UniProtKB/Swiss-Prot annotation:
Keywords: G-protein coupled receptor, Membrane, Pheromone response, Receptor, Transducer, Transmembrane, Transmembrane helix
Keyword RNA-binding applies: no
Name under which the protein is recorded: Pheromone P-factor receptor
Subcellular location: Membrane
Pfam family, one: STE2
Lineage: Eukaryota, Fungi, Dikarya, Ascomycota, Taphrinomycotina
Residues annotated as transmembrane: 46-69, 79-103, 125-141, 162-180, 207-225, 249-267, 283-301
Molecular function terms from GO: mating-type factor pheromone receptor activity; mating-type P-factor pheromone receptor activity
Source superkingdom: Eukaryota
Gene Ontology BP annotations: pheromone-dependent signal transduction involved in conjugation with cellular fusion; positive regulation of conjugation with cellular fusion; positive regulation of pheromone response MAPK cascade
Topology of this chain in the membrane: Multi-pass membrane protein
Amino acid sequence: MRQPWWKDFTIPDASAIIHQNITIVSIVGEIEVPVSTIDAYERDRLLTGMTLSAQLALGVLTILMVCLLSSSEKRKHPVFVFNSASIVAMCLRAILNIVTICSNSYSILVNYGFILNMVHMYVHVFNILILLLAPVIIFTAEMSMMIQVRIICAHDRKTQRIMTVISACLTVLVLAFWITNMCQQIQYLLWLTPLSSKTIVGYSWPYFIAKILFAFSIIFHSGVFSYKLFRAILIRKKIGQFPFGPMQCILVISCQCLIVPATFTIIDSFIHTYDGFSSMTQCLLIISLPLSSLWASSTALKLQSMKTSSAQGETTEVSIRVDRTFDIKHTPSDDYSISDESETKKWT
């Protein structure tokens, strides 16, 4: 049988070739760099560029869908404003990152030969802007989740106040560590100030704690959404209304946000992949928040078109707003008994 052409280039032991060193003349003299190190460096650059390109495409597609399919009334809602701002900030950061990756700052001569004058001034400015945009993205995402927690807990003022305080504390903690990490990175870029020597699994401790706190914040908010929506769905099932509607749509997205960010954070924190992987947690959350509302709106319109006249007796009016909140009101008929009313109060 005829062998493929690449079989002619197979050697029994290729370890000497794989682990060979390349001599690079730098401004401090000649240095030996393993080929495997250069391969890993270029692979990281390629994977990061692919990830950022995917984030940019997702962000542009999502913002177009949100602007075209959202009503003018909903565009004035604070949740819409924060969601749109987070998507725009994410797209802007992706563009700046892509320009930086394609510049001379990632050249082998710059990183191993230390010829830093090859890096243009705009690259340094873009690097600082990238660091400044990170807290903006975190802030807009956290504010969006906090507002939605207040909305979904609006039926109980005490619960709403407690959840708002917890959400605000998480937001402040997450922002504090992200801003601390941002300041350290900017000081290093401008004045080569050494980063903190204390590291956790290879990351600087402010960055690692910021990532863990952000993932925990997402899990907390998604857990609140999932619990409230699941409880509302059970109530609707008890009163005989169980179509696949906006509540189920948002519940699916909430459960996805409950699981996926934690998984990505664990992978990125303890299994070192590549530089661009850490931004996937933010990207998935930012994309999921507006998409859940669009999906719920579409499903609500379908249910509205299929709506038929209500049965005689107790009329249950289910008013579902697609900003992760719901109202269930019971309108009693003439023969509505007091015992039935007390039973209904347990559902609401």
